[in-house]
């Protein structure tokens, strides 16, 4: 299923090729620029480069201790040491609670462990801090679809598409899930944070 593979790659955040650097003060400006370019890009190679650059910005960590925890958690996920990666990302969240990608990485580890409630909580924390996180929205959509919450899955995938219109197969997946029916809930994402989904 190409769409699920695409979402999984997004959810994992290109961990295999990630290059964690010290965060610059211009990170937010850089992300704004990258997202603007992603909206208008048409060349597949440019799209892939922009997506990778966005992920790299998300995983940038400002100091050595936090960077070491991020790298260790990513390495543990790559080695399928998922419980250890949860512990590592929990430590990172404790010392850097505003770091959206720490929440997203822990959400991914929880998802891989099959702990959907914990993953959902961390995804909601991710999008509270980074409302453009198309990887988190893709993961949220996959979990909601798996749980049979089709309208919430649609809402999540639509937000993923809003911030990254190049996700392969997302239009077909949204159409498929809309055909499954269901009433749209008051809280479409199920996150309850007012800032989520901007």
Give the ranges of each region predicted by the language model.
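Register position in tetratricopeptide repeats
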Residues: 78, 112, 146-147, 179-183
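Bacterial N-terminal signal peptides
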Residues: 9-17
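Terminal, low-structured helical/coil segments at or just beyond the last alpha-helical repeat
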Residues: 49, 56, 60, 159-198
């Amino acid at each position: 299923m190409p769409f699920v593979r695409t979402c999984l790659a997004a959810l994992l955040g290109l961990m295999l090729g990630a290059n964690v650097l010290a965060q610059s003060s211009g990170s937010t400006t850089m992300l704004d620029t990258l997202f603007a370019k992603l909206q208008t890009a048409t060349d597949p190679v440019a799209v892939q480069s922009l997506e990778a650059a966005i992920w790299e910005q998300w995983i940038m960590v400002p100091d050595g201790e936090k960077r070491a925890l991020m790298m260790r958690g990513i390495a543990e996920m790559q080695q399928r040491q998922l419980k250890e990666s949860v512990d590592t990302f929990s430590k990172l969240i404790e010392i850097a609670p505003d770091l959206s990608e720490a929440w997203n990485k822990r959400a991914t580890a929880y998802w891989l462990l099959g702990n959907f409630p914990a993953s959902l909580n961390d995804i909601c924390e991710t999008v509270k801090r980074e409302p453009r996180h198309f990887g988190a929205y893709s993961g949220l959509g996959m979990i909601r679809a798996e749980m049979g919450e089709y309208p919430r899955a649609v809402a999540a995938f639509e937000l993923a598409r809003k911030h990254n219109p190049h996700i392969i197969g997302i239009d077909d997946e949204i159409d498929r899930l809309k055909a499954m029916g269901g009433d749209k809930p008051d809280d479409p994402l199920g996150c309850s944070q007012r800032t989520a989904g901007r």
